[in-house]
């Protein structure tokens, strides 16, 4: 797989749909720095296999989404980039490692990043080794990643939920109705405690019925 360093048109560079980090955040300061000093560190991109109507190759950004956004805001037409051919697995590994090292990700973004690698066949042990995390850490994120989109859509602020809140949501994996109710709750902690009580009461009731059935 060849690697080159080139100056590429910003219009030929596209955000990676598999980037764990979904928002670039505030880029005003970075844009100001780029206007005065230029881009000091090249982006890392990979060809996406497409061309525009003029025949120019198109690329996916692997590292440098914030720099690209700031370059566009600064009015730059080209940016320096390292171009590397890579497969989907390597792309995801690089993006996840890069973002976790910078502590940029929200807990759910990080969880979805690990899930993306799992979908490509990367095991928990290998993910832990590549990101410098423990197996327990990775498994915890993967459990969070299983929270379905329907539940996530219950709250406009879902992406900002804390790790503790996401853990509590994941506890209701086997009860989608309760999970959705908790996701949309205005008072998350109070609702969590109430749902836990309801679940314990239901479990006690079911157990009592089972024992009565055995007695007969």
Provide a role label for each language-model segment:
Residues 1-84, 95, 100-103, 180-181:
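Short, charged/polar connector segments at secondary-structure boundaries
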Residues 24-27, 65, 89, 108-111, ...:
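Amphipathic alpha-helical transducer elements in NTP-driven molecular machines
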Residues 48, 84-87, 132-133, 143:
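Short, ordered loop/turn segments at secondary-structure junctions
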Residues 101-177:
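Alpha-helical interaction elements
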Residues 160-163, 168-198, 202:
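Extended amphipathic alpha-helical segments with heptad-repeat/coiled-coil character used for oligomerization
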Residues 206-209:
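Amphipathic heptad-repeat coiled-coil/leucine-zipper-like oligomerization helices
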Residues 215-216:
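Conserved small/polar residues in nucleotide/adenosyl-binding loops
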């Amino acid at each position: 797989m060849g690697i080159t360093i080139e100056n590429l048109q910003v219009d030929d560079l596209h955000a990676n749909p598999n980037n764990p980090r979904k928002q670039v955040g505030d880029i005003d300061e970075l844009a100001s720095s780029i206007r005065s000093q230029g881009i000091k560190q090249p982006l890392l991109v990979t060809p996406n296999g497409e061309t525009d109507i003029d025949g120019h190759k198109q690329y996916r950004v692997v590292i440098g989404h914030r720099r690209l956004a700031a370059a566009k805001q600064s009015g730059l037409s080209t940016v320096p980039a390292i171009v590397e051919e890579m497969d989907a697995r390597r792309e995801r590994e690089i993006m996840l490692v890069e973002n976790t090292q910078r502590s940029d990700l929200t807990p759910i973004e990080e969880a979805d990043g690990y899930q993306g690698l799992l979908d490509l066949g990367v095991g928990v042990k290998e993910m832990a080794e590549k990101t410098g995390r423990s197996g327990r850490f990775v498994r915890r994120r993967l459990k969070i990643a299983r929270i379905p989109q329907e539940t996530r859509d219950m709250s406009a602020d879902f992406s900002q939920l804390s790790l503790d809140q996401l853990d509590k949501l994941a506890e209701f994996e086997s009860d989608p109705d309760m999970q959705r109710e908790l996701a949309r709750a205005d008072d998350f902690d109070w609702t969590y405690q109430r749902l836990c009580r309801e679940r314990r009461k239901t479990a006690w009731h079911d157990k009592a019925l089972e024992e009565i059935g055995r007695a007969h």
